[in-house]
Amino acid sequence: MSGLSIIIPAHNEAAVVARTLRSILANKLDRPLQIIVVANGCTDQTAEVVRGFAEKVELVETPVGSKTHALNLGDRVAKYDLRAYLDADIELSDNALQSVVDAFKDPTVRLAMPRAKHTYRGRNPLLAGYYHLWRSMPYVRKGAMGGGFYAIDKELRGRFREFPSLTADDKFMRNLAKPQERRVVEGCFATVTMPQSLGDLLKVKTRWTYGNLELSAVRPDLNANDQNRHEGALSYLILRPWLWFNVPLFVFVYVYAQLAARKRFALKQAIWERDESTRPFPRTTAAATPAAHQAA
C-alpha cells in the first residue's frame, strides 16, 4: 500500500504552523504518512517550532522566500506517489486525510480535497455580513474555492515537471484536472480563517484576482477546466432579499480587487499580499519582488 506525502511550504508561519501540524497528527490514516515542512526565507521561529515535531515531521530549510521553490523542494523529498499540499495556516478535521485518500479508490479521481470551511472570528458586523454573502454564493458552495489543501495522484503529478512560478499555484493544480477528475469530499473539512479587517481582505482578494489573471495569461489552455464563478449568482441574490444589505460591500471589494490587480498585472508588478490579521504579532512583511510574491 502506497503512503501519503504532505508538503507544507511555510514562510514566517511560527504563529500558526504548530496548530496546523497538530491538526494533521490528530488524523488516523490506514497507510504510511510523510509530513514535510519547507521553511522558506523565514526570519522568525518557524523552523524552531517545526523541530518540536521532529519525530513525526521532516524539516527542509531554504533561504529563498518562494512558495514555488518550496513546493518543488518538498516534491523532491517526497517518497510517495500520492501527494498532498497544505498551506501552513490551515486546520484539518480529524477525518480529513483518510476521507481524501479514500476518494482515490475511484479510478477516475485525480485530485481530491475536503470541503473548505471559511470562518470569520472578528466582530465587525459589516465583514461578518460580507462573509455570510460570499459563503452563500453558488460557486463557493460548490467547492470552487479551495481550502488550502488538496491531494493528487501520480497521473496528475505527471502532467507537469515542476510547479511553475505562479501566484495561484492551487488553482493551477485544480485546473490541471478536468472537472470530472476533481472531487470535493463531503463530511470532512479544511478550516480557513478569513481576514479579520477590511484592509487585509482587500489585500487577499487583490492577490487572488491577480493570481487568476496571471494563470489565465500563462496557461490559457487550462481555462476550459475553470468554473464560471458568476454563473447563477444574480438569480440567487434576487431570490434572497435578506442578503441585499451585504451587496454594497461585496461589490466594493470585488471592484477594488479587480482594478488593483489589473493595474499591477498591466505593470508586471507581481504581488504576494497575505492576510496578517489572522497571524498574531509580530507581523512580517514581504516586499513586492519576484521572490517575495511567491512566499508562502
Segments predicted by a language model, with ranges:
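Catalytic donor/gating beta->alpha subdomain of glycosyltransferases that bind UDP-sugars
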Residues: 104, 118-121, 126, 165-226
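Short aromatic/hydrophobic "clamp" motif used to bind/position activated sugar donors
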Residues: 83
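A conserved acidic beta->alpha catalytic loop
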Residues: 23, 39-47, 64
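Conserved donor NDP-sugar-binding/catalytic core segment of glycosyltransferases
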Residues: 94-125
